[in-house]
Regions:
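Loop/turn elements at helix/coil->beta-strand transitions in domains of secreted/extracellular proteins
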Residues: 87, 105-109, 161-164, 190-195, ...
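Alpha-helical, coiled-coil/dimerization segments enriched in small aliphatic residues
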Residues: 276-306
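Sec-exported extracytoplasmic/periplasmic mature domains
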Residues: 94-95, 101-105, 159-162, 170-171, ...
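Extracytoplasmic substrate-binding proteins
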Residues: 180-271, 362-423
Length: 423
C-alpha cells in the first residue's frame, strides 16, 4: 500500500482531512498520463428497458477507525482517509455540486468549474421549484481563469483551500488539462485529496496508464461514494428510494418498444445539428436510459459534415419524432430564440418533431440526485405526454415550469425534507 507520505516532502497544512491509501499503484498518481476519448457516436442500436437502466442498489460503506477518522474507497483515487467530514469542498461539475446540496452540505462548496452563470443556471432551473433548497453560486470561487474557461489555475486551488476536490485526477493528467504528476500530487498533499470519476460519464477509457486501476460506475453508484465522503448514507438511501420509485412508475407505463417515438438528442446552432448517442453507456444518459428509446440517427443514411454534424436537409431525412436540445434548460432566451428559428424553417413541416412542435429543452447529463429526479420527470412528459401528462413548455426559461401537484411524478416536499435532514 502506498501511503500519501510517499508523495510529499512535508506534512500537509490540513490536519483534519488527509489523503491516504492505494492510488493507481505506487505514488499518488503513478503513471496516470496520456489521453482518453469519451466522444460519443451515433451508430448504436436502441437500448432495451430491460438492460442497464436498472442500477444495483449497492452500498458504499466508509471504514471508521478508533480515533473517529474514516476512509472511502473509489476508483481511480483508491482509499481516501478523512479525519473529519469535509467542511470545504470544490465541486467542479454539477454532479458533485448537486450531490453536496442534496446531502445537506451545500454550504461546504467553495468553488465550481467553468462559467459560473451557466453552472448556476444549470442547477437553479430545478432548485427554483423546491421550497427552501438554494444554491448560492454567485459568490463562489472558480478554478478556471476568466480568460480561459477551458484551463485550470493551480494557484486558485490553494486560494480556495478546500478539504476535498471532487475532480478525477486522471482527467487532470489527460490532454484536456495536461497536468504533470507532481502538479496533481502537490494539490492533494498541500490542500486536500482528489475524489472523482470523470470517465464513467460515458464509460470511456481514461489515459492509458490509469486503465489498470480504473472502474466505471453508474450514476447512483457514483453518488453513493460522494455521500460516503460526507457520511450521509441515510440521505443517499432516501434519495435512491425516490429515484427507484420514479423509474419503476415510468417503466410500468411505457408503451411497447415498437410504439415509442424515434428520438434525436442534439446541440444546434444556426441550422446545424450535432447529434449525441444517448444509447451509449455512462451516467451522462441516466435521465434517458430508462425509456429505452430508439436513436433516430442510428437508422439514417443521411450524410454528416466533416465535424459529424447534420444540416437541416439531413434532419428531414432522419425524420425524428422528438428532438431534445441537450442542456437546453440552462440556455434561457437563447433556447427560445433558437427554437423559434428552427421551427420557422421552410423545411420544418418535413421533420415530424418540428412539424408537431416536439422540440424541447433537455437537461445536463452531469446530474446529481435532485437534477436526476427532475430530468426523469421532464423527459417522461416530453416523450409520452399521453401517459405522464403534458410538458407545460419552457415557461420563462429561468425555472422548471409549474406542474400541477396531481401530475407530478415525484414528491417535491419529500425532496426538501431529505435535504433538510427530515427523513
Amino acid at each position: 500500500m502506498a501511503d500519501n507520505d510517499d508523495c510529499r516532502s512535508g506534512p500537509t497544512r490540513r490536519d483534519y482531512v488527509k489523503f491516504g491509501g492505494t492510488v493507481l499503484g505506487g505514488g499518488l498518481l503513478a503513471g496516470c498520463a496520456g489521453g482518453g476519448s469519451d466522444a460519443t457516436t451515433t451508430t448504436s442500436d436502441a437500448v432495451s428497458t430491460t438492460e442497464t437502466d436498472t442500477e444495483e442498489a449497492t452500498e458504499t460503506p466508509d471504514t471508521e477507525t478508533s480515533d473517529g477518522s474514516y476512509s472511502v474507497s473509489m476508483a481511480p483515487v483508491g482509499e481516501v482517509e478523512f479525519d473529519a467530514v469535509p467542511e470545504r469542498a470544490l465541486t467542479y461539475y454539477p454532479v458533485s455540486a448537486d450531490a453536496a446540496v442534496a446531502f445537506g452540505h451545500g454550504d461546504a462548496i467553495t468553488g465550481i468549474g467553468y462559467d459560473k452563470e451557466l453552472f448556476g443556471n444549470t442547477v437553479d432551473y430545478y432548485y427554483d421549484a423546491l421550497d427552501g433548497v438554494e444554491f448560492e453560486w454567485e459568490e463562489l470561487g472558480r478554478v478556471t481563469p476568466a480568460s480561459n474557461p477551458n484551463a485550470l489555475d493551480r494557484e486558485l486551488f490553494y486560494e480556495l483551500d478546500s478539504d476535498v476536490h471532487f475532480l478525477d485526477p486522471c482527467l487532470l493528467r489527460s490532454p484536456s488539462f495536461d497536468w504533470t504528476e507532481d502538479e496533481v500530487a502537490s494539490i492533494a498533499a498541500d490542500v486536500g485529496p482528489w475524489f472523482g470519476n470523470y470517465y464513467s460519464r460515458t464509460n470511456a477509457d481514461p489515459p492509458e496508464p490509469c486503465r489498470d486501476r480504473y472502474e466505471h460506475y453508474t450514476l447512483w453508484e457514483y453518488l453513493g461514494h460522494i455521500a460516503a465522503v460526507f457520511r450521509e448514507e441515510e440521505r443517499y438511501r432516501a434519495f435512491r428510494s425516490l429515484r427507484d420509485d420514479l423509474v419503476a412508475r415510468i417503466r410500468a407505463d411505457l408503451p411497447p418498444a415498437s410504439e415509442r417515438p424515434s428520438l434525436a438528442v442534439v446541440a444546434d446552432t444556426g441550422g446545424t445539428f450535432w447529434p449525441y448517442d444517448f444509447t451509449g453507456d455512462g451516467y451522462l444518459w441516466a435521465h434517458l436510459r430508462p425509456f429505452g428509446m430508439q436513436n433516430a440517427f442510428a437508422a439514417t443514411d443521411a450524410q454528416t459534415g466533416s465535424d459529424g454534424s447534420y444540416d437541416y436537409e439531413a434532419m428531414v431525412e432522419t425524420a425524428p419524432d422528438v428532438v431534445l436540445r441537450y442542456w437546453g434548460t440552462a440556455l434561457g432566451d437563447s433556447f427560445r430564440s433558437n427554437r423559434e428559428e428552427v421551427l420557422s424553417n421552410p423545411l420544418a413541416d418535413e421533420v415530424p418533431a418540428f412539424r408537431d412542435g416536439r422540440y424541447y429543452p433537455s437537461g445536463n447529463g452531469m446530474q446529481g440526485p435532485i437534477m436526476n429526479l427532475f430530468q426523469l420527470e421532464m423527459t417522461a412528459k416530453q416523450l409520452f405526454p399521453e401517459r405522464f401528462g403534458a410538458w407545460p413548455g419552457y415557461g420563462d426559461g429561468e425555472s422548471y415550469p409549474e406542474i400541477p401537484e396531481a401530475e407530478r411524478l415525484f414528491d417535491r416536499e419529500r425532496v426538501t425534507d431529505i435535504v433538510a435532514g427530515e427523513f
